[in-house]
Amino acid sequence: MRSSSPSQPPSIKKAHRQAKRRAIRRRRIDLQCGCSIYFHIDCTGHGFTHRGIHHCTSGGEWRVYLGDSKSPVFQDIQSRGPAIHQNEDIPCTNTVQPQPEESVASPQSLPELPSLDDFDDSFWVNLFK
């Protein structure tokens, strides 16, 4: 009885050529700041941070880029600045975090160590005997 499978396996080169011609499947994300970002379809479930705001692929901001006249291009966005403080009830504080001043004293975790000049000469003589 004849085998149903061919004696030679099909060439992978044909599949590679077709894959190169195929368009890259990606989604377009239109953010509130006016920026548009594209990400690969297989990258769902991953988040990213843009201008200090974290975005997740499960949110409602994701839209499929369809192209031509159906493209979700939003031209009504006036501001391209980051919208970090949207609630006016919350005062906008200084974004620079103050750093503690440096001091010449020992850190709290280390006890005060004596100066090497305070040791007697006999200490050094006995140390190096």
Curated annotation (Swiss-Prot):
Residues 92-109 have a biased composition (Polar residues). Pfam families: Gemini_AL2. Residues 1-12 have a biased composition (Low complexity). Residues 115-129 are annotated as: Transactivation. Phosphorylated. One of its GO terms (molecular function) is DNA binding. It is found in: Host nucleus; Host cytoplasm. It comes from the Viruses. Its main location: host cell. Residues 1-21, 84-114 are annotated as: Disordered. One of its GO terms (cellular component) is host cell nucleus. Keywords: Activator, DNA-binding, Host cytoplasm, Host nucleus, Host-virus interaction, Inhibition of host innate immune response by virus, Metal-binding, Phosphoprotein, Suppressor of RNA silencing, Viral immunoevasion, Zinc, Zinc-finger. One of its GO terms (biological process) is symbiont-mediated suppression of host innate immune response. A motif (Nuclear localization signal) lies at residues 13-28. InterPro entries: Gemini_AL2. Belongs to the geminiviridae transcriptional activator protein family. Monomer. Homodimer. Homooligomer. Self-interaction correlates with nuclear localization and efficient activation of transcription. Monomers suppress local silencing by interacting with and inactivating host adenosine kinase 2 (ADK2) in the cytoplasm. Interacts with and inhibits host SNF1 kinase. Binds to ssDNA. The zinc finger and the transactivation region are involved in PTGS suppression. Strong activator of the late viral genes promoters. Enhances the expression of the capsid protein and nuclear shuttle protein. Acts as a suppressor of RNA-mediated gene silencing, also known as post-transcriptional gene silencing (PTGS), a mechanism of plant viral defense that limits the accumulation of viral RNAs. Suppresses the host RNA silencing by inhibiting adenosine kinase 2 (ADK2), a kinase involved in a general methylation pathway. This is Transcriptional activator protein.
